[in-house]
């Protein structure tokens, strides 16, 4: 009988422990290798308390500035932006129980300054954007999650009217379509989104039937995101601190420009600024874009026609906001600041889209990218 009751007590204890753990989620932060940064930081987020606690740091001195998780959640990939002429990428195994990382392998990105990495929805192919090299590189994912050598690479060409920033190609991001049939590659210099059809099994790409979409010269395409309904898409225009809106043909992948150079800065801001990152809440009601200089998140309401109407600006409580994260449940926004070495946490009103600073500022040297694991 005592054994029976002991077994019950152990079972209840384990259930309570599991329940407590379920309120905590794993987050990963990519950084530049300056000011004492160790590389990639792993945090545990307590949703009830609204706090982040560090649980691991992974040594990587080559500026693992941007991160992406495998669809299975079992692997994580980072760029190694570094100062090397030819950049690199790294693969890590994820301990599903703890969220901690173990290094698997690295590969060349076949281009300098890799700044963005993404994984297709089958988990078979990784796309790397080489900012310095002006190219897109495609790598296969092996059965154990490690990266194979590059199987494809596309070199862009051209210049733009901004002679300081658009002097040569600068590929800035590669974003997968919701149906996983196309990848959209932003080049800051050519003011184009280049569109490629994907062969995920072979880890190859080829130009789509409509091979690109253009925005106003000098705008500087950076990051790109899709509306949850897949009908609309939105582009950060870094150099003009604006955003562009597109409709999308699901069959051909072609984009049609609906709005261009929509202002994102506060009306009273007159200083220097470049826009950085862009995300939409899971309900498809609100869009947010980060501004470096103004140090704000611009907040837009999304209409039924996909068009944007600005509803506010939120100071980010830090300097140089780069990547940011809307948590999957839509309750919080986390903002990574490159120059104030912190991540700030905001509570989000899902009805109005407005943000409230929680007072939580988490120290991370040269924070650039923040993502959350699917658990």
Residue ranges of predicted features:
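Blade-loop segments of beta-propeller domains
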Residues: 54-123
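Short loop/turn segments immediately following beta-strands, especially the blade-tip
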Residues: 43-50, 92-99, 138-149, 196-205, ...
